[in-house]
Swiss-Prot record:
Originating species: Kluyveromyces lactis (strain ATCC 8585 / CBS 2359 / DSM 70799 / NBRC 1267 / NRRL Y-1140 / WM37)
Protein name: FK506-binding protein 3
Key words of the record: Isomerase, Nucleus, Rotamase
Biased composition annotated in UniProt, kind: Basic and acidic residues: 225-239
Residues annotated as domain PPIase FKBP-type: 332-418
Amino acid sequence: MSDLLPLAAYNLNIEPYTPTPAIDVTTPVTVRITMAAIDPEALDDEKNPSTLRIIKRNPDYDDEDDAGGLLGDYDEDELDISEEEEEEEEKSKSKKGKGKGKSKKQEEEEEEEEEDEDEGDEELIEIDTDDEFQEFVLATLSPKTQYQQSLDIVIAPEEEVQFIVTGSYRVSLTGNYVKHPFDAPGYDDEDDDEEDDESYDEDEDDYLTPDEEADLEELEDASDVEAKIQELVEKEQSKSKKNNKRKQPEPEEEEEEEEEEEEEQKLVEETKKNKKAKKEKKVEFKKDLEEGPTKKEEKKEEKKEKPKTKVLEGGIIIEDRVTGKGKACKKGSKVGMRYIGKLKNGKVFDKNTSGKPFVFNLGRGEVIKGWDIGVAGMAVGGERRIVIPAPYAYGKQALPGIPANSELTFDVKLVSLK
């Protein structure tokens, strides 16, 4: 079964005493059934166990062969005539029998025997027609003893297969629609025809026109052939030289082309510079958080003061990189933050640099203790680095990307305050 490639899930509900086709006509795909399960809800008061049966057409049964064997080479008109002749013969025989002096009882007994023979023939015909289908039991399921039964049945679309359930419970079949190796399209005769056409076309290319054949006859001599080839080569060379001379541009045209190329190059460089400037604006905040304020100009660098460093409760260190404007946040303030969290070795384990800011109520225990202490006092637009010892971070607790007893460094920026 390893060659069967699952395509989709297969499910089929079978109601009691309702023959159900295994494959729908609208989806002619091979199925593999792997499980039969009983619905524990009974559909009648008897609550009899449900038996699942598979009904399939007998491959040895053939309607056409049987009909052909019976009819032979006769047509319908000949059969009708022969039936009429047989009826007349039977009537004449019955008259002769009566003329021979048979009693009424004997005649009645003979008629009963004939009727019995006819009934027997009908039963035989019914039995023969029953052989058209084969029935097999797959499983008997009951809520009291067995809810489900594993199966492994593969059914192709060309097979005429139905399922039927006898009992008080419906049965559900599950499995997969699968791609069977035999489902692959066979070798098409049209491919042969196409290949023959291609080979025929190729052969046609090898044939020569009458003019070409005449030229070959004229050049029977090997020396003539060589001379002709030499002439053709010289003609081709002279043509190529003329073309090269024509293609050489004038000096003025070259200068104009160079000027146009320079202008295009300038435009490309200007657009690149504009794009770079936009990108620098976008990532300016991110770079400030990760690497500190960028050094844009030497004059500004001289004027800037060094970040103010403070040590707070529990050894928490804060460095104010940029001082915000407005009122400072305090306990109970609702603050919106951008941040980048790093381990002591510089590895980033978490960040919020775009999208919706991280919002929390300061001093209410909604974040780690180091944040409640380290963020207090910041104003909107302020940027700060907070170094938090392990006891004021996650302590001995290990989280994804954060080992136990880790010292954490956060570069934060206050973007909103309520």
